Each structure stands twice: as structure tokens, then as C-alpha cells.
């Protein structure tokens, strides 16, 4: 595993409990190593570049904006640092894995600080960090923990309802280096609060850049709280993007997630949701669209740990060229989780006879009064629909585009915020 376990002095080196947590992460990753096809949870997704290339941890003093210019001295008119967002948002930015100030002016009752600031100031952050992640089960989360430093602590206080989303923009400019960076986010939505959080991952500069972004988020949704969580993964086509979100939802809480993946050579978005108390619910939807030789993996694990909980999943993918789509979806119903509902559906559209989709739906049911279902299917574009559209004067390429858009539409319609929905639709 060249270049992944390195000696690096990290902030907070004198904090005993933090050093202990980092050491546990380092030991867990050293024991497990990189996941391979023999690892059940990774049997369809190969981390090709991670086992072959050397990687460099980025230097913080290389302060760059998204196009590679020095921060505050950008001369590129089309750079994202000069672009207006398509919807109002509180914007937070990361460049090459490092937070770039300033903080936006936030309403009362909303705390946002870097993770290291929070771990030195906030007992809330210290008491929650690392509690939702099983390091032995998730080796790349263990690797992330070994380098635990960069990331955000977001706390939405009791009863606060945000008037616009928090947008976390992540931009990579590798400058020809094989960069490797880890981000760790801790998000708390307290009882009765409501928020939207959007994450974007993109590159600027050379599209053939090789880099590895390893993201872990721990998310707490309180009683009767609501979190709508959106993500766009549009990394460079030779990058590797691996993300794990571990979510805990309390009584009456609602967690809504939508992930759109279209970039990276290997991209994996994994979410683990624990519905811990009655009336907790989760809706986890995703779309992926790719071509070339890419592999895009969507993995979900919904754990119904209490009675009267509900979950729904809808995942749709479009695969072209020699690319491969992966969906692994697990619904676990604990013995005491009676009168629970869990639904899961995956559909894929294959645009090439070389395209591949691997699907592994799972139901683990240990209660008898439940309503659960799962389904999966893949197919090609309807030739009759194509013929009909061609006969109406629509050229073949436009007809294909329209049919693909229509195929993905019912997944995108699950996004409640119309501005975000239209923006993501334009990106996909």
C-alpha cells in the first residue's frame, strides 16, 4: 500500500485522547490493509490505483484557489471562485483538502468551525467524534482516522431552521502530483432543527490528475429534526473518491439524502443509517452516470433498530462504454423493530454492450410484523421510442439524451428543493 501510511506531524499532537484515536485508526488500517475483491463489501469494486501508485499528502502552505492561482489573486474569469452559485447558500470551501476562509456570516444558533477548533473548544464534538464508525469494519475510515485533522464541525442548535443551504465546495488542483487527502466532518442537527447541506467534489486543471480523496462524515439527527443532505461527485476522471457517511436518527427525525456521481476512475459513496428510535425515517436516493472505464459504486446499509421506523431507497444508473456500475443495498430489521417499512429499488440503463452493472440487494429481517421489498433490473434504451422520436425529426443523439434524462427524472424528483434539483439535473 505505497504512500498511504506516512509519518506526518498533525495538529493537536499533544491531545492524548485524540492521539489515541488516531493510533487506533492507524493500527486498524495496518491490520486490514486496502479492501480487495476478497473483501465481501468490496467484491465488485477494485481500488486499482491505490495499490500501485505513490501518493503525497498536500502541503498546507500551497494556498491555491480552485484554478490553481494564489488565493485572492485569481486572474481566470471562468474560475469557480468568481462564479455565482445557482441558488443562495452559506458557502464553505476546501482546496486540496484544506479549509479556505472566510466563514460565511451564519444565523444565530448555527455553529460552523474547523474540526480541530471544535475538538479543542467543544465538548459536544469530543463526545461524538468516532462513535458511529467501526474502524475494524471500514478500513478506509480507519485510514481517515489515522490522519484525523481537516474537516468541519457543523452544529444546528435546537429548534433552528436554516433559511438556505450550507454548501461545502471541495476543489482539487493536483499540480501534477498524486495527492492524497482526508476530510472528516461531524454534523449535529439538534432536536427540532432543520437544515440542508450540500457537498460538491470537483477538480480544476488537468483532467488526467491522479489523486485520492477519502471522506468520512458522522451525522447526528435529533428528535423531530430534519436534515436534507445532497452530494455531487464530479472528480477528475483518473481520481479515486471514497466516501462514508454514518448517520444516526432519533425519534421522529428525518434524514433525506441524494447523491449524484459522474466523475472519478473509481468512485464509491457509502451511507450507513441507524434508525434508533420510533418514527425515525430515512430516504436515500442516488443517480450515477458514466462512460469510459470508470467504476461508480453506491453502497447503502439501512439499520432499523426500533419499531415504527421507515426507509426508502431509489437508485438509478446510466452506464456507457466499458464502465461499471455497482449497487449494494442492505436493509437490516432488528428483532424489536416491529411494524417497520423498508423499500429499495435499483434500475440501470446500459448504453453499450460492454457496459456492466453489478447489483447485490440484501434483506436481513429478524422481526415478523414488517413490510419490506427490494427490486433490481437493468436494460437498454427502447428502440421503439428511439424510432418514434427519430420519425418526429429528432436526431439520434438528441433522442438518446432525452430518453436518458427521462429515465433519471423520477429519482431526481425526490429532491425537495427545486433549485437544488434543477442544478443537479443540469450537472448530470
What are the language-model segments listed below?
Residues 1-216, 226:
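Short, low-to-moderate order helix/coil transition modules at the start of elongated helical scaffolds
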Residues 119-394, 408, 412-428:
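Conserved beta-strand/loop scaffold segments within soluble protein domains that form the structured core
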Amino acid at each position: 500500500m505505497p504512500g498511504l501510511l506516512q509519518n506526518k506531524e498533525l495538529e493537536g499532537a499533544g491531545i492524548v485522547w485524540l492521539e489515541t484515536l488516531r493510533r487506533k485508526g492507524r493500527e486498524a488500517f495496518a491490520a486490514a490493509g486496502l479492501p480487495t475483491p476478497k473483501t465481501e463489501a468490496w467484491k465488485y469494486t477494485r481500488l486499482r490505483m491505490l495499490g500501485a501508485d505513490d501518493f503525497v499528502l498536500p502541503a498546507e502552505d500551497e494556498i491555491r484557489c480552485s484554478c490553481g492561482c494564489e488565493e485572492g489573486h485569481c486572474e481566470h474569469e471562468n474560475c469557480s471562485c468568481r462564479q455565482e452559485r445557482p441558488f443562495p447558500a452559506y458557502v464553505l470551501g476546501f482546496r486540496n483538502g484544506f479549509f479556505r476562509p472566510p466563514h460565511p456570516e451564519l444565523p444565530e444558533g448555527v455553529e460552523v468551525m474547523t474540526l480541530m477548533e471544535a475538538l479543542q473548544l467543544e465538548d459536544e464534538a469530543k463526545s461524538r467524534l468516532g462513535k458511529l464508525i467501526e474502524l475494524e469494519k471500514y478500513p478506509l475510515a480507519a485510514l481517515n482516522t489515522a490522519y484525523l485533522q481537516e474537516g468541519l464541525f457543523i452544529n444546528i442548535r435546537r429548534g433552528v431552521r436554516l433559511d438556505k443551504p450550507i454548501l461545502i465546495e471541495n476543489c482539487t488542483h493536483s499540480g501534477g502530483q498524486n495527492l492524497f487527502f482526508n476530510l472528516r466532518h461531524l454534523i449535529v442537527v439538534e432536536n427540532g432543527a432543520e437544515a440542508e447541506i450540500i457537498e460538491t467534489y470537483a477538480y480544476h486543471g488537468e483532467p488526467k490528475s491522479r489523486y485520492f480523496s477519502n471522506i468520512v462524515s458522522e451525522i447526528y439527527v435529533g428528535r423531530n429534526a430534519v436534515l436534507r443532505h445532497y452530494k455531487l461527485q464530479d472528480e477528475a476522471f483518473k481520481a479515486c473518491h471514497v466516501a462514508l457517511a454514518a448517520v444516526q436518527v432519533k425519534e421522529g427525525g428525518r434524514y433525506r439524502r441524494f447523491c449524484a456521481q459522474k466523475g472519478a476512475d473509481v468512485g464509491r459513496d457509502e451511507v450507513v443509517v441507524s434508525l434508533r428510535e420510533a418514527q425515525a425515517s430515512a430516504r436515500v436516493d442516488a443517480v450515477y452516470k458514466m462512460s469510459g472505464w470508470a467504476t461508480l459504486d453506491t453502497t447503502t446499509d439501512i439499520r432499523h433498530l426500533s419499531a415504527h421506523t421507515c426507509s426508502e431507497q431509489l437508485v438509478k444508473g446510466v452506464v456507457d462504454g466499458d464502465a461499471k456500475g455497482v449497487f449494494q443495498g442492505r436493509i437490516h430489521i432488528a428483532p424489536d423493530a416491529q411494524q417497520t417499512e423498508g423499500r429499495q429499488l435499483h434500475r440501470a440503463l446500459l448504453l453499450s454492450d460492454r457496459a456492466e452493472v453489478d447489483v447485490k440487494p440484501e434483506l436481513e429481517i429478524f422481526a415478523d410484523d414488517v413490510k419490506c421489498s427490494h427490486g433490481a433490473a437493468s436494460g437498454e434504451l427502447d428502440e421503439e421510442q428511439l424510432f418514434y422520436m427519430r420519425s418526429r425529426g429528432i436526431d439520434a443523439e438528441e433522442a438518446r439524451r432525452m430518453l436518458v434524462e427521462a429515465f433519471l427524472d423520477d429519482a431526481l424528483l425526490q429532491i425537495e428543493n427545486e433549485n437544488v434539483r434543477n442544478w443537479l439535473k443540469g450537472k448530470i
